[in-house]
């Protein structure tokens, strides 16, 4: 539940209209509710194996790298705070927008309610828990919705001529499915498309903060991490207690658990018994790997 946890921790979405940033002083920015700015990174004083900074290559690929000196980067409030905290960067603000009209804290209340309902449903193996999960993730995903520039229509043979005569300017392609039905793909106007991309960006950045607190601490403790994805880390089981203890010292809360913002083993099996771990893993690329599992009580 990474994104629901991020929304809960974010507390609320920004209210009001963005204002053009004229005061390029970071001390001014820190006092605002939120901001989205372009910075130029002058110096990176600390590097990580899993860098928190990125840039686009000439091929359009996002490259996560420590080599960011004299590079421009677009950041929101959370991201800038993170790279200052962990990479110890020195930077200048180039331009941007800021918000200073508060936040709508209804988000936190709604997410907590849905999260608790899902926990209760999972306890009784009620499949409605999947609906609660979808609702929570949609509170994030809907904010970043890209323009939908096509729509699909199914038309019977009897209505074919009428449909084509009224819509010929918008038809992208058509396909006859059977003796009595056609499938048309039409161009759709995006003039009235609207999203809340700034809200989605803040949720994504907060989700990365949740991961950064674990990833960066583990690296500072010289704990090896073999692979990390959106909401998971492959790490030696023998090092988890050390990581959890240090995490609690730093943050004043438990790392391990199934509550909001906590981490737990994600392996499950109907065959293996006891604590389920991976004895070996083969990684081929992003989201392409296999784990060989065993159970502490079944081998």
Positions of predicted regions on the chain:
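Conserved acidic
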Residues: 1-299
């Amino acid at each position: 539940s990474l994104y629901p946890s991020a929304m809960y921790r974010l507390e609320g979405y920004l209210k009001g209209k963005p204002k053009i940033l004229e005061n390029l002083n970071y001390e001014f920015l820190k006092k605002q509710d939120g901001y989205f700015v372009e910075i130029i990174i002058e110096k990176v004083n600390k590097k990580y194996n899993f860098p928190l900074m990125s840039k686009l290559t000439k091929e359009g690929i996002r490259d996560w790298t420590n080599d960011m000196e004299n590079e421009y980067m677009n950041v929101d409030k959370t991201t800038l705070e993170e790279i200052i905290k962990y990479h110890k960067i020195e930077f200048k603000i180039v331009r941007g927008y800021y918000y200073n009209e508060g936040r709508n804290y209804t988000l936190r209340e709604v997410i907590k309610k849905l999260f608790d309902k899902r926990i209760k449903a999972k306890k009784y193996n009620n499949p409605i828990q999947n609906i609660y999960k979808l609702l929570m993730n949609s509170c994030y995903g809907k904010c970043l919705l890209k323009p939908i520039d096509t729509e699909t229509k199914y038309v019977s043979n009897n209505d074919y001529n009428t449909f084509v005569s009224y819509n010929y300017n918008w038809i992208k392609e058509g396909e006859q499915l059977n003796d009595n039905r056609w499938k048309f793909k039409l161009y759709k106007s995006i003039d009235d498309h609207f999203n809340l991309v700034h809200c989605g960006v803040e949720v994504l950045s907060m989700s990365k903060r949740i991961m950064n607190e674990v990833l960066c601490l583990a690296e500072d403790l010289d704990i090896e991490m073999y692979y990390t994805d959106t909401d998971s880390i492959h790490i030696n089981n023998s090092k988890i207690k050390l990581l959890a203890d240090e995490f609690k010292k730093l943050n004043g809360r438990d790392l391990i658990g199934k509550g909001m913002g906590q981490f737990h083993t994600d392996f499950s099996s109907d065959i293996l018994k006891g604590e389920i771990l991976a004895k070996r893993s083969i990684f081929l690329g992003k989201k392409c790997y296999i784990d060989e599992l065993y159970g502490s009580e079944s081998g």
